[in-house]
Regions:
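A short amphipathic helical element positioned immediately N-terminal to and/or at the very start
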Residues: 3-18
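A hydrophobic alpha-helix feature that marks transmembrane segments and, especially
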Residues: 39-40, 250-273, 285, 290
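Alpha-helical transmembrane segments
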Residues: 11, 20, 30-58, 70, ...
Length: 361
């Protein structure tokens, strides 16, 4: 039987409804999209959990209680596989705005590295590092009508507002909620704290923070703690991803695909046995089964993959491609199961079974 004849017969079977292509298409599309979507939703949930932690500075650690070398602290950000950002701080003199003589505002002196950390932590994404003036929290800016580039008159003189940072109440250290931050040189004396931000978390961070200590005080030893204590300190993003419940969805999809492939052939086994009795070769029959299955199974898998692409691009906040790669394994496994099961089921059909199939029809 020529290739053109096999292809035309397969297309006629699909067009006439003999192959039940529409039903099988919908079954593959539904199974692939639901299982793949479940996997995508699970990975996106883990992604959002990680994003929430990063936004809330749950990935930031601080060392306090002793003298800190500001220069060493700022340079932690340049260490290979070390913190992405690091900066030092110390409490400064209270500042009294000229407009409210009886109201002091706590101020902190910070190194340039701390400014980078504050700018990166801003959820709006509009904050830019600038050490040319003071930084004020959004609450202070709201109460005094301050804006970036504008003046702020205090009992220590008039300063330019270089930045306004947001400091939400999400479990993080509350000292910056209502504060003025004054940039100083990292070599300007010692500091009382060093903050380091590293994602994913590493045991190396604590060791690096201790390296910033100038001189330890036996009565007040240095201690390392999280900037945001509202999150689990033992959180492991990689372990959460590897142990997610939906990691088995490709296997479930493979099982569904095998079932659909078997059903698609067994429901037509009398037809296939009759074709063999009429002189059709086994090779031509298997090729016809492969073409029909490829058409309805492949098109359904492609359509499901398209839906998953749209979902991942729309819902993923940071890395849609990584989510998509995880999700597409499911429709791929489903399609592989359909093709393999259909071909193997076709191999089991023989001409000698015609009478038995007809008898049990």
């Amino acid at each position: 039987m020529r290739l053109g004849s096999v292809i035309s017969e397969a297309l006629r079977n699909i067009g006439s409804g003999t192959a039940h292509a529409v039903v099988m298409f919908l079954a593959v599309l539904l199974a692939g999209t639901l299982l793949g979507g479940y996997e995508a939703a699970s990975v996106i949930g883990l992604e959002r959990e990680a994003t929430t932690r990063i936004t809330a500075l749950a990935d930031t650690t601080t060392i306090m209680g002793t003298a800190i070398d500001g220069s060493v602290c700022d340079r932690l950000a340049g260490i290979d596989d070390g913190p992405s950002m690091a900066g030092a701080m110390r409490i400064g003199d209270p500042l009294t705005p000229v407009s409210t003589p009886g109201k002091d505002i706590t101020s902190y002196q910070i190194t340039p590295g701390m400014i980078d950390l504050l700018a990166a932590a801003d959820a709006t994404g509009r904050t830019r590092p600038d050490a040319s003036g003071i930084w004020v929290s959004s609450d202070v800016a709201h109460d005094f009508g301050l804006a970036v580039g504008g003046p702020f008159a205090t009992d220590h003189g008039t300063a330019t507002v270089a930045g306004v940072f947001d400091w939400p109440n999400d479990g993080r250290d509350t000292r910056f909620v209502y504060a003025i931050l004054v940039p100083v040189s990292a070599t300007d004396g010692t500091f009382t704290e060093c903050w380091a931000r590293q994602w994913p978390a590493s045991d190396q961070t604590e060791t690096l923070l201790y390296s910033t200590v100038v001189a330890a005080d036996g009565q007040n030893p240095a201690g390392v703690m999280a900037v945001n204590k509202g999150f689990d300190s033992h959180y492991d993003a990689q372990a959460g991803y590897l142990n997610r419940m939906t990691r088995w969805t490709p296997l479930a999809a493979l099982a569904v695909g095998l079932l659909l492939g078997i059903v698609s052939v067994r429901r037509r086994r009398l037809e296939y046995a009759g074709a063999l009795h009429s002189g059709q070769t086994k090779g031509a029959q298997l090729l016809g089964i492969a073409i029909e299955t490829l058409i309805w199974g492949g098109s359904a898998s492609a359509a499901g993959a398209g839906l998953l692409v749209a979902y991942c691009v729309r819902m993923s906040q940071s890395d849609p491609m990584a989510v998509l790669v995880a999700a597409l394994r499911t429709p791929a496994a489903l399609f592989a199961g359909v093709m393999v099961a259909a071909m193997l089921s076709g191999l089991t059909i023989r001409e000698s079974q015609l009478f038995r199939f007809f008898k049990h029809r």
